[in-house]
């Protein structure tokens, strides 16, 4: 037993997670009714979601209160990269539709009581109202736009505080970070539970009914992750981007895939940024901001499902209209965190461009919920891993350096 524990401690976290995935897969097939195993996954995700808002709040306040005048944070570059990548992903999804046009069987209404927004203006109105939420309520409800807003305000206000007060805030941030590390070390057990739940509840039958749709969605996201994002990174860094890209996918994308929550993956991304030696003043803000607005995966989902509906109804779409759809999808995706139901509930906004009725659009949303187990996992993995990628790329960029 001692030898086993010693070997386990020396094993890297990714290898431990891989072992957890394999065990969860077999347990889901062999003992699908052992629901207690799934509880481990719920506890893990719950722990990450519980600590993440406090982590963001304390880190941002601490970083801003001790920020040096004239210090460079690269935030404008990072936001530019977030927007560029989201639009590029939306455009790639349009191109994929021309190569692999999909059609859907629209006969089952969406199994959801959620109502889609009436337009982009409603999406951003909701987002703006969430920003000025009560800070205590924002932390308890994991409203990251509001958490960031108030953390920035408090951080700037604390710049004039004495050093002892700033050190106390830093100690609180360090203690929160330590709790996060303890929770992340439980990832192999938690992910084992998540894999078990996914396999025992959904099985693999979903692949047969919606295999082509899943293949196109996942394939497009992989293309963006392994081709488009590396091209953007190369343009910025002027060196081989793949070691960084693959590191982000391995250390951030894998956990995001199983937690299916950008918010829950914030602590994982913070730790990865620390391991990469990035500037804490920058990543303490860019990572939670990315979790809210960096939505390349959402843009892909919106465009592919919307254009599949267009193809199903026999509507002809010229490229200028498809380009406009890319703009709408990119803008809508950036506001996905302000909509209950995320990217799927923004599909009716995009469908409205083509005069598709809300009834039909909600049937498309229903198809999205059916493939959501795989779609949402891949979407979150792409979104969350690129938060770290573009934070690192901005810091390593050749532009602006003498």
UniProtKB/Swiss-Prot annotation:
It is found in: Cell membrane. SUPFAM superfamilies: Proton glutamate symport protein. The keyword Membrane applies. It catalyses: L-serine(in) + Na(+)(in) = L-serine(out) + Na(+)(out); L-threonine(in) + Na(+)(in) = L-threonine(out) + Na(+)(out). GO terms for molecular function: neutral L-amino acid:sodium symporter activity. Its main location: membrane. One of its GO terms (biological process) is threonine transport. Pfam families: SDF. Keywords: Amino-acid transport, Cell membrane, Membrane, Symport, Transmembrane, Transmembrane helix, Transport. It is a multi-pass membrane protein. The chain crosses the membrane at residues 19-39, 43-63, 86-106, 138-158, 179-199, 212-232, 287-307, 327-347, 354-374. One of its GO terms (cellular component) is plasma membrane. The keyword Cell membrane applies. PANTHER family: PROTON/GLUTAMATE-ASPARTATE SYMPORTER (PTHR42865), SERINE_THREONINE TRANSPORTER SSTT (PTHR42865:SF8). Belongs to the dicarboxylate/amino acid:cation symporter (DAACS) (TC 2.A.23) family. Involved in the import of serine and threonine into the cell, with the concomitant import of sodium (symport system). NCBIfam families: PRK13628.1. This is Serine/threonine transporter SstT. It comes from Streptococcus agalactiae serotype III (strain NEM316). The lineage of its organism: Bacteria, Bacillati, Bacillota, Bacilli, Lactobacillales.
């Amino acid at each position: 037993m001692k030898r086993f524990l010693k070997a386990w401690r020396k094993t890297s976290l990714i290898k431990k997670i891989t072992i957890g995935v394999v065990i969860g897969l077999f347990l889901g097939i062999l003992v699908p009714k052992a629901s207690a195993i799934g509880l481990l996954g719920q506890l893990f995700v719950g722990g990450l979601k519980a600590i993440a808002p406090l982590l963001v709040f304390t880190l941002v306040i601490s970083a801003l209160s001790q920020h040096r005048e004239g210090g460079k944070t690269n935030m404008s570059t990072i936001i530019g990269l977030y927007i560029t990548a989201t639009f590029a992903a939306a455009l790639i999804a349009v191109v994929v539709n021309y190569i692999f046009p999909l059609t859907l069987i629209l006969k089952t209404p969406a199994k959801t009581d959620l109502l889609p927004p009436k337009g982009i203006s409603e999406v951003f109105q909701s987002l703006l109202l969430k920003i000025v939420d009560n800070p205590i309520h924002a932390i308890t409800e994991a409203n990251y736009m509001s958490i960031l807003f108030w953390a920035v305000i408090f951080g700037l206000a604390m710049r004039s505080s004495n050093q002892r007060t700033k050190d106390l805030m830093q100690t609180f941030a360090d203690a929160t970070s330590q709790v996060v590390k303890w929770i992340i070390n439980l990832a192999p057990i938690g992910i084992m539970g998540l894999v078990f739940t996914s396999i025992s509840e959904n099985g693999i039958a979903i692949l047969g009914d919606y295999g082509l749709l899943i293949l196109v969605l996942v394939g497009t996201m992989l293309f963006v992750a392994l081709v488009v994002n590396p091209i953007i990174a190369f343009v910025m860094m002027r060196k081989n981007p793949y070691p960084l890209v693959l590191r982000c996918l391995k250390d951030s994308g894998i956990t995001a895939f199983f937690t299916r929550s950008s918010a829950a993956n914030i602590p994982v991304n913070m730790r990865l940024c620390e391991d990469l030696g990035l500037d804490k003043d920058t990543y303490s803000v860019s990572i939670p901001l990315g979790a809210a607005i960096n939505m390349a995966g959402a843009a892909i989902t919106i465009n592919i499902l919307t254009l599949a509906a267009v193809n199903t109804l026999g509507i002809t779409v010229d490229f200028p209209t498809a380009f406009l759809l890319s703009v709408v999808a990119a803008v809508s995706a950036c506001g996905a965190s302000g909509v209950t139901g995320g990217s799927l509930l923004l599909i009716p906004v995009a469908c409205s461009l083509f005069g598709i009725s809300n009834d039909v659009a909600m049937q498309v949303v229903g198809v999205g919920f059916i493939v959501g187990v795989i779609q949402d996992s891949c979407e979150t993995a792409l979104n969350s891993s690129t938060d770290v990628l573009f934070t690192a790329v901005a810091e390593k960029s050749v532009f602006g350096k003498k």
